[in-house]
A protein has these predicted regions:
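Motif-centric detector for short Cys/His coordination patterns
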Residues: 1-86
Length: 86
């Protein structure tokens, strides 16, 4: 089966300003993901409408939007920045 490393699943997501997501993972980590670089092309580009972007929700593994757009779990985790909890 190779060396697949399982990423934590998304437990909750909060939309922040400037197309960023505050993502809470099931391992207790909270990370900030900047989605702006991904909002290109006809499919993910639809999310440039902040009213649509604001409808992000956890789908059990990653973040999803109403039309079915998702961010690959590896990208969401690896390209996000951990934040310190109080």
């Amino acid at each position: 089966m190779g060396g697949d490393i399982s990423r934590p699943a998304v437990a909750n997501v909060h939309v922040l300003s400037d197309f960023r997501l505050r993502v809470e993972f099931d391992n207790g980590e909270t990370r900030i993901f900047d989605a702006k670089p991904l909002l290109q092309g006809p499919w993910l580009g639809m999310l440039k409408n902040f009213g649509f972007f604001d409808c992000a929700f956890p789908n059990g593994r990653t973040v999803e939007w109403l039309e079915g757009q998702t961010i690959e779990p590896d990208v969401l985790y690896d390209e996000s920045v951990a934040i310190a909890e109080d």
